[in-house]
Amino acid sequence: MKRHLVAVDIGGSKTAFLARTVGSDRKASVERYKTPASGGVGAMLALLDEHIDGLAGGRSSLAALGVAVPGHVDPNGHVVCAGNLEGWVDVPLREQLEERYRVPVFVEGDANCGALGEKWLGAAKEMNDFVFLALGTGVGAGVFVNGSLHRGAHSAAGEVGDMTFPRRKRNGAAPTLASIVGKRALKKVVRRETGKKLTAAEALHRAAKDRRLERLTREFIEYLSTSVVAISSLLDPEAILFGGGTSKAGEALLKRVRETVAPNHVVRARLMLAGLGSEAQLYGALWGAQNALASSQALDAVEQLPQAAP
């Protein structure tokens, strides 16, 4: 029976699944489902069950699982918090999944997964210092320094969505980067002002030829560009890779960010689209599942070695 590696990218609005046969390097198809709006972790586990049970060979064919979570995850796969998911606070997710499926499990923050995916199969294969900027329902960054994923002292490196801008207070509170650059925020502004139901990526793409949309997306570009300058001045990366659903705006997005940051000479990094596009996080989770399986097999091999004589 063929055994499968399953990767899951949990987003604030959509959850993507990818299954690949162990040992294969063939590109697998991606399936997307609506992320449960309520029910917390239990609702997501039910969605996982449904997908995994639908594999050829069913649950018994699952070899390892990799999961990208939109939030703060510690090195042990414990979800500290995931702000865009109801009830996801202090969740021992890796432990729960290992008990549920009895296979090796990898759990990581989605931005970190994006960086891992790009380093493995994407635009950063030859880079040692780069930042993957995940633009979706929220905003996060996966950081590579000297060829390794940088987590920080509290495993919270890259939580750029929490950056605040005190000089632009709204209703007495300083807005965060995520509150402006998150795709729901831009979608809401566009719909309120134009009546059009456009995704953030669509609005940014059309803004190149639509003055009204250009004006409505200007604040988005300004805030995003400010974060690019901050990241560049702090880390001096070789490149900043734009991924996540909003990156589907493509060169229309990059062109405006480049033009906005151009006067600031601290930005030496190349501003690029992620090589794997909006699937970078999914492939990072797949890398994690593959690595978890290999580590488990190596441990099993060691445990099966004959014991040395006393």
Predicted stretch roles:
Residues 152-153:
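A short alpha->loop->secondary-structure connector
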Residues 9, 66-70, 132-138, 142-144:
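Short beta-strand segments
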